[in-house]
């Protein structure tokens, strides 16, 4: 199931720092990075989506061999004010950095950074982790840092610009992060050229798959031809990725955590509590 090739590019940024505190087994922390209002809810309501607002999450995997931060929020920490900040359709009350600090970590303690994809609601604080080793699909990195930069770049791209010089592991498929099969990056292109999801096998909770934006709402798993944001990517490639993940969920008897599912996200325990 896990196939692909990995190559390593070493840039000028320093090596990632060692993990903060050794652990004997894998832990998964869930960070609340705010919520998003739907910009066009009616088509979603017409297809049976009852709540169109979306949660925004980031996750910290703590492994005996290091740490992995998965996604980095929707509004940069330095813009978050006491009482919360709203930017466009996003509202955030807690900084990512403060949630890390609450469990004893700072950005320099993060061994690896992996983004499900480059969109603004998953990458806002990426520059804080430029000293970590960045795990990214080749096609995603090429889209983020094209050989010929666009004349009118998205201003949100500045929020991950420091990753260009990070120590980088460039992926061409699935990737075993720590070498023991417990934390697997799963290549799921379609929503973006190098979109990826994350399978974490926890000793007590069991296997959990973090969706990224492969799914936004649970309805997508049962409604045919329902890709609410298909205009952003390649629907046919995304459909193949969904089939791959559904087969993987069945094979591993894994639980799917849809990162934007605001109802399911509300039921998850948040850091400083953790799953193990």
What do the predicted segments below correspond to?
Residues 33-34, 72-74, 118, 139, ...:
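Active-site metal-binding loops of divalent metal-dependent hydrolases
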Residues 1-6:
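Bacterial N-terminal signal peptides that target proteins for export
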Residues 9-18:
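Hydrophobic h-region of N-terminal signal peptides that target proteins for export
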């Amino acid at each position: 199931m896990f196939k692909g090739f990995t190559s390593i590019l070493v840039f000028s940024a320093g090596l990632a720092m060692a993990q903060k505190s050794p652990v004997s087994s894998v832990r998964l922390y869930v960070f609340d990075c705010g919520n998003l209002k739907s910009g066009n809810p009616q088509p979603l309501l017409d297809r049976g989506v009852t709540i169109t607002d979306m949660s925004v999450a980031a996750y910290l995997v703590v492994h005996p061999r290091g740490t992995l931060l998965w996604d980095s929020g929707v509004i940069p920490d330095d813009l978050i004010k006491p009482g919360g900040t709203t930017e466009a359709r996003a509202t955030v009350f807690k900084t990512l950095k403060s949630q890390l600090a609450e469990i004893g970590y700072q950005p320099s303690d993060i061994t690896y950074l992996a983004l499900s994809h480059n969109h603004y609601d998953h990458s806002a604080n990426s520059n804080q982790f430029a000293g970590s080793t960045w795990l990214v699909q080749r096609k995603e990195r090429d889209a983020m840092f094209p050989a010929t930069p666009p004349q009118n770049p998205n201003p949100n791209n500045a929020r991950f610009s420091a990753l260009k010089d990070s120590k980088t592991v460039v992926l061409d498929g699935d990737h075993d992060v720590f070498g023991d099969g417990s934390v697997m990056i799963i290549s799921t292109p379609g929503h973006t050229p190098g979109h990826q999801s994350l399978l974490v096998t926890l000793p007590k909770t069991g296997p959990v798959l973090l969706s990224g934006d492969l799914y936004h709402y649970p309805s997508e798993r049962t409604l045919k031809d329902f890709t609410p944001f298909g205009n952003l990517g390649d629907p046919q490639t995304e459909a193949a990725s969904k089939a791959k993940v559904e087969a993987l969920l069945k094979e591993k008897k894994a639980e799917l955590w849809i990162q934007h599912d605001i109802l399911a996200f509300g039921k998850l325990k948040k850091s400083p509590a953790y799953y193990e």
